[in-house]
Amino acid sequence: MDRFLVKGAVGSLKRRMEQEQTGGGPAGLAEEEGNSKKNPRRAAPGNGVDSAGLTWGRIRAEGLNCDYTILFGKAEADEIFQELEKEVEYFTGALARVQVFGKWHSVPRKQATYGDTGLTYTFSGLTLSPKPWIPVLERVRDRVSLVTGQTFNFVLINRYKDGQDHIGEHRDDERELALGSPIASVSFGACRDFVFRHKDSRGKHPSRRLEVVRLQLAHGSLLMMNHPTNTHWYHSLPVRKKVLAPRVNLTFRKILPTTKRTTLLTASASVGSFALHS
């Protein structure tokens, strides 16, 4: 049986925020959130309120360590969403395609990267140089840093035009990531299901059967994926044909500059312990 953890763990905070705001959200958002037919089977354990007044849902399982909150009130989230739609420049051409088993396919979503000058990052076999930060991304990044105490120098942006766009099971375990650093996932637009599956529970004949953990990532929400989550758990955003509205997701990361990465690779290779991931 799947373990269904929805945003209800911080629902009371979200409702208070929305009562203070006026106006509607992105087209289709309220309908998608309000008319969901899925009921929570278990609330997120260990919830608490931090010094900034944010209510956090603590999501824990074997090797799974995540924290979830509503970071932006509705009006501010709407404003940021509209700015992202206007300002972000997404990949085109070859960068919008991916090679799988020798065949090239269009990526089922739009992608972009922004970050500090001089960084490179490998994603799905592509080595990317991020675009310079723009104000709307700095605004979100700085808010995340303020409430978490973490710093980030890179962001990967995924835009899902509707529920047909998706991303398959994967782990964010690229060698460029600073060892043990968290990934901050901020969502704007349509509420979408987000699924965690343990590495030992994948495939037709898994070695173990651990519960799948399902979340619903709301407009303006922050999901902190802390170490060692990406070591043990794959995550995905599955197809949801009934979702008609777009979603934009920002995943803030801390990646190593090329010089430090080369030093780490050389040192690790000398003891035969470095494994490459793409």
Swiss-Prot record:
Its EC number is 1.14.11.33. Gene3D superfamilies: Alpha-ketoglutarate-dependent dioxygenase AlkB-like. It is an enzyme of class 1 (oxidoreductase). Residues 151-256 form the Fe2OG dioxygenase domain. Signal peptide: none annotated. Dioxygenase that repairs alkylated nucleic acid bases by direct reversal oxidative dealkylation. Can process both double-stranded (ds) and single-stranded (ss) DNA substrates, with a strong preference for dsDNA. Uses molecular oxygen, 2-oxoglutarate and iron as cofactors to oxidize the alkyl groups that are subsequently released as aldehydes, regenerating the undamaged bases. Probes the base pair stability, locates a weakened base pair and flips the damaged base to accommodate the lesion in its active site for efficient catalysis. Interacts with PCNA homotrimer; this interaction is enhanced during the S-phase of the cell cycle. Interacts with nucleolar proteins NCL, UBTF and NPM1. Interacts with XRCC5-XRCC6 heterodimer. This is DNA oxidative demethylase ALKBH2. It comes from Bos taurus.
